UniProtKB/Swiss-Prot annotation:
GO terms for biological process: translation. GO terms for cellular component: cytosol; small ribosomal subunit. This is Small ribosomal subunit protein bS20. Residues 1-20 are annotated as: Disordered. GO terms for molecular function: small ribosomal subunit rRNA binding; structural constituent of ribosome. Binds directly to 16S ribosomal RNA. InterPro entries: Ribosomal_bS20, Ribosomal_bS20_sf. It holds the Pfam family Ribosomal_S20p. Keywords: Ribonucleoprotein, Ribosomal protein, RNA-binding, rRNA-binding. The lineage of its organism: Bacteria, Pseudomonadati, Pseudomonadota, Gammaproteobacteria, Enterobacterales.
């Protein structure tokens, strides 16, 4: 438990930030799932448009520090490899 007034404020702030980060991580997972569902349905154009949008969101969150830049690169690379395997 926080002892000082500033520690209590810091605790509140960290809780708010954790909630915000969880929301953003959930958003990223949703965009990734949209690409994967488009790949599963074998819809190349939908997969590519969803990939472009997902790529933009992942890069933005990697710049903000939500995820590591190497994880962002790995995710984009693996997802695009799945799209390429469709024969795109």
């Amino acid at each position: 438990m926080a002892n000082t007034k500033s520690a209590r404020k810091s605790l509140i702030k960290s809780k708010q930030q954790r909630k915000c980060n969880a929301s953003r991580r959930s958003m990223l997972r949703t965009f990734i799932k949209k690409v994967y569902t488009a790949i599963e349905t074998k819809d190349k154009t939908a997969a590519m448009t969803a990939f472009v949008f997902m790529q933009k969101k992942i890069d933005h969150q990697a710049c903000k520090g939500l995820i590591h830049k190497n994880k962002a690169a790995r995710c984009k690379s693996r997802t695009f490899a799945r799209i390429r395997s469709m024969g795109f």
